[in-house]
Amino acid sequence: MGRLLAIDYGRKRCGIAVTDPLRIVATALATVPASELITFIKDYMSREQVDEIVVGLPTTMSGEPSDSMRYITPALGRLRKELPAGFPVVMWDERFTSTLAHRAMLDAGVRKKGRQDKEAIDRMAAVIILNSYLDSPQSKK
């Protein structure tokens, strides 16, 4: 069984999280510039078995795709072209992940300076996306 990899995609940078090979625990992996995302993922997948990629889907409070989709959709198209044909890429609701990441850091006692680290928040948001997906029936397919 291979790992799951989650991406919290942003215009400037992307938070990335992965599971362990048994898909029990999700951990933060890295924050990479958006322009280097595909290279990073290809390199990681050359070293580790990844069976599925989960990408945060930014939605509005009403559940509609947000304006951010206008830059995420082309990036996903480029990513899919670089992956093997039919490789599973799942879009997953990411509402409130940045807020939840900030709250988790606060609860963990991270000082204010650490909570203002946008890269750390992006990584934590990717972990939250991945944990949400792992908790869903869809991830068990």
Question: Where do the model's predicted regions map?
Answer:
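Phosphate- and other anionic-substrate recognition elements at nucleic-acid/protein interfaces
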Residues: G2-I7, R11-K12, A17-K141
